[in-house]
């Protein structure tokens, strides 16, 4: 028996295989720097169990040191201090618990024993419970403690909110909390997220090699748009230390660009208020400890040096935190990452989260800095803006403009990824049709970038006067496993100059 179907019209839309989705993962700033090696927890709520062992949320951990156990949260207690709360004592009417073996009223009491790994042992004596020395079964008490971070602390992590930063790297500061400060500045300037990698070692014991190790870990991350190294405030590091780290970071950028994981390097210099070796000098190419001297050292289209070095910020307690040029670089990186289109120029855009001196330089000084390859932040009437979004390479518009360099990376990344996803390792062989398909796919990719506003256009003809070349694909005669594609693109350049000629008449 045949199936009955009433009169109808069937319509099926067949996807066009040559329409390429160019949407990719967000491009994020990445920060490397020193952070806490010990974490602190205040007033974690714990419910007394039926056995003599209770477990903290951090278990299993190393070197857990309990600093306070209380019946209520917020109890102010420091052993031997006269500024304790009135109920900071042990007993039925007190709010404090003490370790077993403590002496209260000339008697040794039962209490808690920290096992050092996140577990707490309590005495089971009912008399101790009735006296308030031990919490009763089912009751809630509050524990403050510190513990050593694990190796996971030193792996790259992605953050999109400030509280997660605080939970991982502590409250803002310019020493232990410097990663929280730097990453918060990136987020406050609009970046959807930020990648952070803590350098191994404490504030008093970190090295160039530990910075190198953290930078190397970013090799695994494909979403990095630029990398920034920050350093804690204080007598360390030395100028040589910073130079060694920046040199290695520059090598990292060059290496990753050579293997198809394109990214850039943002950096700043220390101020005299942040580091004894800091400086705030315009200088020239011959003076190494000057803005222009540092920009000359890394004159490259993938490098951005941000000035000034004297930067500060107010934390949640309304305290001034002295920062340096690295944090200014974080602010600019956040503005850059906030743009939906890589082609968007950020010259004139506002920067938030940091403070700089108002009217620090006059027009001529800022022009000198710009000519030397320095991106200058200016504060006019309290509004901090990017005076000119440039790299350290002033060779041409293609190398100097940040948005043009970003377009270049986008074209490289998109062509590489989409052609690889479509053709490589797909069991395809090279024949005349394959060559034509690769050419057509290249055209579709570039057209998608043009339609989305990421580039001005792509070449459709050969014009030796402009350098335009049409898209062509051909099998390599020397390496028959390769298809060679040639094409050209025209970038979207920022409008920076307008020339007006005025004539007079009578």
Feature map (PLM): residue ranges:
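A glycine- and small-residue-enriched flexible loop/hinge signal that marks low-structured segments
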Residues: 1-45, 54-63, 67-69, 81-86, ...
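C-terminal edge-of-domain segments
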Residues: 472-506
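Short, ordered beta-strand-loop transition motifs
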Residues: 45, 104, 108-123, 270, ...
């Amino acid at each position: 028996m045949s199936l009955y179907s009433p009169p109808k019209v069937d319509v099926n839309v067949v996807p066009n295989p040559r329409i390429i989705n160019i949407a990719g993962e967000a491009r994020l700033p990445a920060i490397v720097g020193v952070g806490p090696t010990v974490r602190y927890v205040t007033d974690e709520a714990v419910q007394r169990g039926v056995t003599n062992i209770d477990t903290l949320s951090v278990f299993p951990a190393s070197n857990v040191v309990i600093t306070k156990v209380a019946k209520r949260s917020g109890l102010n207690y420091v052993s031997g201090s006269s500024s304790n709360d009135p109920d900071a004592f042990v007993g039925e009417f007190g709010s404090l618990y003490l370790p077993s073996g403590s002496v209260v009223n000339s008697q040794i009491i039962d209490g808690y024993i920290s096992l050092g790994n996140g577990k707490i042992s309590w005495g089971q004596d009912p008399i101790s419970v009735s006296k308030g020395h031990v919490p009763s079964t089912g009751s809630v008490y509050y524990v403050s403690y510190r513990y050593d971070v694990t190796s996971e602390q030193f792996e790259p992590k992605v953050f999109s909110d400030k509280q997660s930063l605080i939970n991982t790297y502590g409250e803002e500061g310019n020493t232990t909390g410097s990663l929280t400060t730097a990453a918060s500045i990136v987020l406050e300037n609009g970046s959807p997220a930020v990648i952070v990698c803590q350098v191994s070692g404490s504030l008093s014991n970190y090295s160039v090699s530990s910075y190198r190790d953290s930078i190397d870990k970013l090799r695994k991350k494909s979403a990095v748009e630029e990398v920034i190294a920050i350093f804690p405030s204080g007598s360390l590091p030395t100028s040589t230390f910073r130079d060694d780290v920046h040199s290695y970071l520059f090598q990292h950028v060059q290496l990753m660009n050579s293997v198809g994981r394109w990214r850039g390097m943002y950096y700043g210099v220390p101020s005299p208020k942040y580091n004894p070796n800091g400086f705030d000098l315009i200088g020239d190419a011959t003076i190494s400890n000057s803005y222009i001297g540092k920009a000359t050292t890394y004159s490259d289209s993938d490098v951005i040096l941000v000035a000034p070095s004297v930067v500060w910020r107010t934390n949640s307690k309304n305290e001034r935190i002295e920062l340096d040029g690295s944090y200014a670089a974080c602010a600019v990186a956040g503005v850059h990452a906030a743009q939906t289109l890589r082609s968007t120029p950020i010259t004139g855009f506002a920067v938030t989260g940091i403070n700089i001196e108002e009217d620090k330089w006059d027009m001529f000084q800022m022009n000198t800095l710009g000519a030397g390859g320095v991106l200058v932040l200016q504060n006019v009437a309290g509004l901090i803006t990017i005076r000119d979004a440039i790299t350290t390479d002033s060779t041409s518009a293609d190398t100097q403009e940040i948005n043009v360099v970003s377009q270049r990376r986008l074209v490289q990344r998109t062509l590489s990824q989409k052609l690889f996803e479509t053709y490589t390792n797909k069991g395809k062989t090279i024949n005349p049709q394959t060559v034509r398909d690769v050419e057509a796919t290249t055209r579709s990719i570039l057209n998608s970038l043009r339609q989305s506003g990421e580039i001005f256009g792509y070449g459709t003809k050969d014009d030796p006067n402009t350098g335009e070349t049409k898209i062509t694909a051909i099998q390599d005669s020397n390496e028959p496993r390769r298809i060679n594609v040639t094409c050209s693109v025209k970038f979207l350049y920022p409008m920076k100059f307008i020339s007006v000629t005025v004539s007079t008449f009578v």
